[in-house]
């Protein structure tokens, strides 16, 4: 779908909205007038008024809209909203309103969290989403509830606090829906020990920097990939290094992402718990064995239940379980049954993801038929009803590009069990110091900006460039 800008260069703001509203139409930026399908976003800047117009033609039908904004009120955010709202109104002549209205970003809760922190009531924050951004009442309510959990989690933070993420970029196999840069253990098992050697060097160096800077670690998250592809002995070595080199005495949450149930056994779960971890994530994605096989996950629903019971026996304070709505071969009835089985286990947290068709994933090639957007909407609505009935509330929420139906991912929790790292990371509430291959450190600057530092993506690159990684950590901590 062609996109022509006239009188402005806010391409990103308009492009992201076009991708969200017309995900099935390939994006084609142009600089010259055209005929046929496409969109034109125009802005005329006068002495007193800014006038935005949008005209969208698709399959022989055309939608048009025009809006104005006083020049005196036209700061950068207001101008972008003007362009997006004008484009949105033109698009609504051609399609049904989406659940998230004109919002195209991945963190819609930032708007409502800011509103609550500024003293607005939950009702006023909901109204902001509905009236300014055309968000549906249902999504507005979810957003505000997640923001209320964010405000509560913020009360645990102190100025010197940071969170630490440790990445293990290895998996047993690659799932069909995943684009994460991880290495299959079947092919790269020889890299595990050298990778741990390099990672422990980064851990030790980071511990020195944390002490020198006076920073304290509030939450610690070991993710991946699948960290539990490591053996029990390797997990003990990693976690002992963390305990030795980094002061963990002021942690309020320690999570390990077990992920694939087929990588979990009693020995690993007991080892992880004995090293101080209190929160375990076990992610079936579905409890339908046929769907599991279709997406390349080599485990069964029975293995998920067994891993959960082993985690309970090991004494974890909280267990999270993930499900994905929209997997190939799934349908609303099957998804509801997966959730029923998960709720019967009674985990403290349930995260309901919406399938995102990521460009690096096997599913992106389109070789498998996926549930319709209407089916995904039914899955999510049914999940919300079941989770609320079971006593869960939303505690964090985010969106991704190319999601089925342009919906969202939501973390649900029982009272008092919100996953704090997830909130702090997703809401960018404080600096996240990240270690390992593919990890990204985010430093929150005093002026509100974020400075990002990327580690090499692939394990072999990480090993070869570990000295550069340590030097980059020095640069990051100079900003803290």
Functional labels for PLM-detected ranges:
Residues 1-120, 199, 415-480:
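Radical SAM enzyme core and accessory elements
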Residues 61-63, 68-75, 119-124, 209-215, ...:
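Short, glycine- and charge-enriched coil/turn segments that flank and shape catalytic ligand pockets
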Residues 182-383:
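Conserved non-cysteine loop/helix-boundary elements of the Radical SAM core domain that shape
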Residues 167, 281, 349-353, 423, ...:
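Beta-strand scaffold of nucleotide-dependent catalytic cores
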Residues 90-97, 117-164, 213:
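N-terminal [4Fe-4S]-dependent radical SAM core
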Residues 29-39, 360-435:
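A C-terminal junction/extension of Radical SAM enzymes
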Residues 52-54, 166, 280-282:
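Short beta-strand motif preference
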Residues 161-196:
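Canonical Radical SAM [4Fe-4S] cluster-binding loop centered on the CxxxCxxC motif
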């Amino acid at each position: 779908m062609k996109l022509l800008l006239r009188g402005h260069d806010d391409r990103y703001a308009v492009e992201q909205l076009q991708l969200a509203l017309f995900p099935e139409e390939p994006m084609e930026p142009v600089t010259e007038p055209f005929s046929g399908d496409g969109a034109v976003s125009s802005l005329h800047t006068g002495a007193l008024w800014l006038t935005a117009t949008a005209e969208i033609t698709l399959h022989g039908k055309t939608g048009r809209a025009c809006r104005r904004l006083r020049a005196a009120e036209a700061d950068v955010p207001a101008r972008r909203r003007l362009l997006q709202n004008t484009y949105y109104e033109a698009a609504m002549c051609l399609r049904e309103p989406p659940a998230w209205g004109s919002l195209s970003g991945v963190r819609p809760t930032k708007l409502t969290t800011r509103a609550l922190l500024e003293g607005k009531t939950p009702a006023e924050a909901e109204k902001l989403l509905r009236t300014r951004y055309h968000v549906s009442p249902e999504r507005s309510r979810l957003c505000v509830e997640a923001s209320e959990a964010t405000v509560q989690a913020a009360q645990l933070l102190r100025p010197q606090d940071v969170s630490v993420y440790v990445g293990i970029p290895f998996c047993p196999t690659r799932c069909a829906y995943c684009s994460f840069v991880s290495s299959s253990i079947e092919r790269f098992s020889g890299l595990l020990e050298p990778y741990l050697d390099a990672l422990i060097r980064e851990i030790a160096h980071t511990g020195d920097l944390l002490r020198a800077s006076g920073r304290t670690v509030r939450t610690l998250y070991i993710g991946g990939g699948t960290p539990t592809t490591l053996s029990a002995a390797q997990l003990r070595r990693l976690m002992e290094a963390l305990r030795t080199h980094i002061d963990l005495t002021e942690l309020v949450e320690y999570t390990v992402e077990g992920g694939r149930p087929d990588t979990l056994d009693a020995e690993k779960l007991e080892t992880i718990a004995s090293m101080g971890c209190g929160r375990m994530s076990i992610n079936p994605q579905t409890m339908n064995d046929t769907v599991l096989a279709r997406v390349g996950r080599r485990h069964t629903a029975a293995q998920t239940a067994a891993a959960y019971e082993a985690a309970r026996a090991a004494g974890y304070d909280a267990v999270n379980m993930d499900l994905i709505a929209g997997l190939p071969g799934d349908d609303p009835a099957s998804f509801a049954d997966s959730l029923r089985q998960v709720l019967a286990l009674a985990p403290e947290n349930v995260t309901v993801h919406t399938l995102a068709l990521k460009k690096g994933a096997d599913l992106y090639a389109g070789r498998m038929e996926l549930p319709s957007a209407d089916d995904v909407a039914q899955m999510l609505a049914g999940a919300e009803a079941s989770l609320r009935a079971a006593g869960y509330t939303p505690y964090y929420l985010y969106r991704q590009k190319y999601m089925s139906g342009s919906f969202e991912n939501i973390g649900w929790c029982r009272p008092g069990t919100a996953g704090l790292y997830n909130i702090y990371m997703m809401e960018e509430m404080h600096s996240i110091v990240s270690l390992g291959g593919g990890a990204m450190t985010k430093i929150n600057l005093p002026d509100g900006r974020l400075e990002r530092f990327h580690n090499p993506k692939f394990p072999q690159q990480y090993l070869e460039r570990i000295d550069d990684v340590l030097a980059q950590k020095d640069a990051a901590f100079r900003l803290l």
